[in-house]
Swiss-Prot record:
One of its GO terms (cellular component) is plasma membrane. Keywords: Cell membrane, Membrane, Transmembrane, Transmembrane helix. This is Uncharacterized protein Mb0986. The chain crosses the membrane at residues 23-43, 63-83, 90-110. It is found in: Cell membrane. It is a multi-pass membrane protein. It comes from the Bacteria.
Length: 115
């Protein structure tokens, strides 16, 4: 059985865009690693208050855990969605950007826990 040439061209284009998508996902994983590393400095955000009445150091660890779990969940879910869609023949170049937006929301949530 012969596959029409139009399908072969569209399949090559899809594969090319998916390769680019997975490379962008690798950059997203690097950004996620940077976000986890950045969360290690959350304790410095509570140093501005020298009075024991406004001590907020008990917020640091929950904010760090929020960041760690959130980054892990975003990276895992983004990868699962990308693999599932690429196995169906869909282009997945947009999903790392959705993951980047989700990482931003994770940071906002961790910052809300911290302050």
């Amino acid at each position: 059985m012969r596959v029409p040439s139009q399908w072969m061209i569209s399949s090559r284009v899809t594969v090319a865009w998916n390769i680019v998508g997975y490379l962008v996902y690798a950059a997203l994983a690097f950004v996620g690693g940077f976000a986890v590393w950045f969360s290690l400095f959350f304790a410095m955000a509570t140093d501005g208050c020298h009075d024991s009445a406004c001590d907020a150091s008990y917020h640091v660890f929950p904010a760090m855990v929020t960041m760690w779990i959130g980054v892990g969940a975003v990276l895992l879910l983004t990868l699962v969605v990308m693999v599932r869609n690429s196995s169906r023949g869909n282009v997945v170049i947009g999903w790392p950007f959705v993951g980047l937006l989700a990482l931003g929301l994770v940071y906002v949530a961790a910052d809300a826990v911290l302050h």
